[in-house]
């Protein structure tokens, strides 16, 4: 890890409200722990208690560069938007996989089928990734990077990256042609028409370029072999924004290496190839040997001519000069030694990090054995979990249900945040016998419907959810079922109908990942709660029960003939939390109240389904200007809400393209472009 000298920059938290409830004590405990040098801490925060706000206060007080880890892109986008709002004057960056579509290279021996790597890079996300690494290498203190598990995958060496940075100063001696050669070496492309990130144009003694991580362009004017002036301007309008005394040009790609290192690497690749060919031929694997030689020599020729080749990351070990088995460089290496790591939803994120290495290793081993890659390709990999734990200096795990691993790492000490600003208590839990469960459940659901409230019912199998849904519909209830076989767009449409009031009961198997934090949900029923195992363990039961935690009348029903250890743990923990929450409310005269969302706020969260409906209407000729219909909803949305909408719609656009429904993909693309323009107009 690099030892970066901090060059200043203080975090400045901005919020219209201050810490309330047990947030002040949680902030103090976590801050004291960081300053004391505690390596691992755990924040147990119930749903709706403001965990992100608490973490933001800790970051501001310890004033250290921070990595915030999330287990999926959508939640990462949401966290990014929230933290941008809390820290508008600081560097809040975004680092996720930059692929809109990614099919990894693979080989299926049983079918003798090779699947070539296929991908589509999202230029905007690539720019944001470059901006994140640039901010970290600038040495500034006030940097927050929100990342998915992409942070444990291989990157170029930070030392190599820094060595390639070009510093420009007004009045410095610099040959124009030499500067152009440096730009090409940094993977900038000449394009006299489209001036976009990573491209430059030349007009006499004037060179315009857009750094790979920026949206604004630089204009460098030469007078002979001297830099006469440096200006920043808008590449779209051409408007000059300011005059600069100096500028730094960062590489336009994550993987860079100077020509000398590349020559050494190519020699090492040649040597490994010779050894591997001898081994394959000794095993009489002549087809594999021929295949490997042809592919590797082609890559070497491309590196010799262009300084780059497709799949160059598979040779990263040689380019970086690492030893066999040595871990790759990754985003963590770009942080200074004393950075802070916040793991959001740690009970899901940490197991995800643990599983990345095994899947990657299995796929690449097959490629190596059959002559598609050199053995060194195995070292282009994500970090092992043990390596990740060694690299993170201080960690705060955040979860409503921390697992045994977080508790063990934290020495059993947990910082609790159980008080909600709304005064809401954890929902009450009742246990009922299995005999007569459907009639009992039906009566409770009808009680909720009479109050305009929603119900969630969880079954153990998809078949059970469909049958129960059909039974409810037969009795006149507005019911729907939800499980993994339902397509993403249809799932979003179902959630939209639930939030808009068209559905009264939602039946499903695993409703944890759907983001069903709805204030209208006042009843959660769990069938077969005593079937210990997947989705009926203590963590899952607690997460499911939390779906009723945003309504003052929230109630959870466990249908079971016995109380399992997991059920007992959840019942005892819920009662403990309710007692603490009730005592706090009585002491401070707080009356619990349900969270209230306007119709616009409800519909914002299902924007993808709304876009599908507008697309359908457009095909029928019912609509010409989709932006007019969106405008009213957008006016009520925050910047982070719109960014989350774009992330969801990007995923649906890619799915439409994969299914060759290019008309739908183009329609979604147009809406995404409109939303991105709206984001630029909104305040940070």
Curated annotation (Swiss-Prot):
One GO cellular component term of this record is:
cytoplasm
Which residues of the sequence carry a binding annotation for ATP?
A: 45-52
Where would you find this protein in the cell?
A: Cytoplasm
What UniProt keywords are attached to this protein's entry? Answer: ATP-binding, Cytoplasm, DNA damage, DNA excision, DNA repair, Excision nuclease, Nucleotide-binding, SOS response
Describe the location of the Helicase ATP-binding domain by residue ranges: 32-420
GO MF terms held by the record: ATP binding; ATP hydrolysis activity; DNA binding; excinuclease ABC activity
> Could you tell me which InterPro entries the record lists for this protein?
Helicase/UvrB_N (IPR006935), Helicase_ATP-bd (IPR014001), Helicase_C-like (IPR001650), P-loop_NTPase (IPR027417), UVR_dom (IPR001943), UVR_dom_sf (IPR036876), UvrB (IPR004807), UvrB_inter (IPR041471)
Q: Which GO terms describe its biological process?
A: nucleotide-excision repair; SOS response
Q: Which Gene3D superfamilies match?
A: P-loop containing nucleotide triphosphate hydrolases, UVR domain
Q: Where is this motif: Beta-hairpin?
A: 98-121
Q: Which domain of life is it from?
A: Bacteria
Q: Which SUPFAM superfamilies match?
A: C-terminal UvrC-binding domain of UvrB (SSF46600), P-loop containing nucleoside triphosphate hydrolases (SSF52540)
Main localization, broad class: cytoplasm
Q: Report the residue ranges that make up the Helicase C-terminal domain in this protein.
A: 437-603
Partners and quaternary state? Forms a heterotetramer with UvrA during the search for lesions. Interacts with UvrC in an incision complex.
What is this protein's function per UniProt?
The UvrABC repair system catalyzes the recognition and processing of DNA lesions. A damage recognition complex composed of 2 UvrA and 2 UvrB subunits scans DNA for abnormalities. Upon binding of the UvrA(2)B(2) complex to a putative damaged site, the DNA wraps around one UvrB monomer. DNA wrap is dependent on ATP binding by UvrB and probably causes local melting of the DNA helix, facilitating insertion of UvrB beta-hairpin between the DNA strands. Then UvrB probes one DNA strand for the presence of a lesion.
Q: What is known of its domains?
A: The beta-hairpin motif is involved in DNA binding.
The identity of this protein, by name, is UvrABC system protein B
Source species of the chain? Chlorobaculum tepidum (strain ATCC 49652 / DSM 12025 / NBRC 103806 / TLS) (Chlorobium tepidum)
- Which gene underlies this protein? uvrB
